[in-house]
Amino acid sequence: MTRFVLFISCFFLIGMIVECKDGYLVGNDGCKYNCLTRPGHYCANECSRVKGKDGYCYAWMACYCYNMPNWVKTWSRATNKCGKRK
């Protein structure tokens, strides 16, 4: 029984350490991926392309992805460069 509790504790600890990223996908121009005129599965495909688990077209008409690796660039209000000149 003690080993089982120890195993479950380690499992949850690993789950807390290996965090995944959620957010809006960002293109090279710094803008969110637009999905207004795309087919319904477009965002899910784009999210899986960057190793995300799932994605959908959010109310802002942009692709939102779940459980992506930390190296994937996501949109942030603080670092927003969309529509701004370089």
From Swiss-Prot:
One cellular-component annotation, GO: extracellular region
Signal peptide range: 1-20
Pfam families: Toxin_3
GO biological process assignments: defense response
Disulfide pattern: 31-82, 35-57, 43-63, 47-65
GO molecular function terms listed in the Swiss-Prot or TrEMBL record: sodium channel inhibitor activity; toxin activity
Residue numbers bearing the Cysteine amide modification: 82
Cellular compartments annotated: Secreted
Record key words, sorted: Amidation, Disulfide bond, Ion channel impairing toxin, Neurotoxin, Secreted, Signal, Toxin, Voltage-gated sodium channel impairing toxin
Domain LCN-type CS-alpha/beta per the UniProt entry, residue ranges: 21-83
UniProt entry tagged with the keyword Kinase: no
Keyword Secreted applies: yes
Tissue-wise expression: Expressed by the venom gland.
Primary localisation category: secreted
Function: Beta toxins bind voltage-independently at site-4 of sodium channels (Nav) and shift the voltage of activation toward more negative potentials thereby affecting sodium channel activation and promoting spontaneous and repetitive firing.
UniProt free text on domains: Has the structural arrangement of an alpha-helix connected to antiparallel beta-sheets by disulfide bonds (CS-alpha/beta).
Similarity comment: family membership: Belongs to the long (4 C-C) scorpion toxin superfamily. Sodium channel inhibitor family. Beta subfamily.
Protein name: Toxin To11
